Every structure is written in C-alpha cells, then in structure tokens.
Amino acid sequence: MKRGLMLIDRGSREREAEEELEIICKKVKEKGNYDFTEFCFLEVVPPFIEDGMEKCLKKDIDEMTIVPYFLYPGKKVKIAVADAMKYQKDTKIKFLVSKPMTMHRTLVDLVDSRIVSALKENEISLSKDKVDVLVIGHGSMDPN
C-alpha cells in the first residue's frame, strides 16, 4: 500500500515557516515510511490547499493522511479539512484526517524549553519558579 501525507498549515510570509515544514515533512516521511509528503497553506501564500491536493492526487497512492498543523481545532481548521475532503469524491485514494496537534506532553516540554531559552538569551538569572509566563493563543470565532 502506497501512502502519502499532507500537512495543512495556516500560512506565513516568513520563509522560515516553509523551511520548517520542509524539514518536518522529510522527517515524518522517513519515520512513517510514507511514499511522499507535502505541505500546503490555508491562506496567506501558496501552495494553497487546492495546489497541495492536486499535486497529491497525481501521485500513485492508495491512502493519504491529512494533518491539520494547528494547535487547536477552530473555524479555520474545520474549513481547511472541509476543503481538503472535497477532493475525496473524485478519487479512489482513501483519506485519513488526524486531529490538530492539541495537548500533548511534548508541548509542556516545548514551552518549558522556550522559557529557559528566553531567560538565557536575555541574560536573566532567575529560577523558573520566579518567572511569570503569559501564553497567548490565536483564538477562534468557532462557537463549537
């Protein structure tokens, strides 16, 4: 069975976003034994969902996993998944959709690592228990 993976990100004009997604796709491809991996963007810059899906559907695969590369579900994530799933009716490829990233123990480690890095980069010698942290999320207009 040949498998593909599509990461759907919000999109950013920052070149680093694309570079990081390329690295993530490469590593997930190796780790998950995917025949190919691609990424696309919901908005801001191409490749957009239509571009990514059309490219994927040209591949000789049996199954494609779609990963919404967002922390939490919301209106935009639901739109992204719905847009991707529109292509299901025109193909024999089986689509699997994962949940967005959501809560995972590695996120706690990541936040902790960012705090430690910020303290070092700013030459602040406080212990972590003396530091207040404000976490800012994007938010969603989705009532569900």
Model-derived regions: residue spans:
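Active-site-proximal alpha-helix that buttresses catalytic centers in soluble enzyme cores
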Residues: M1-N144
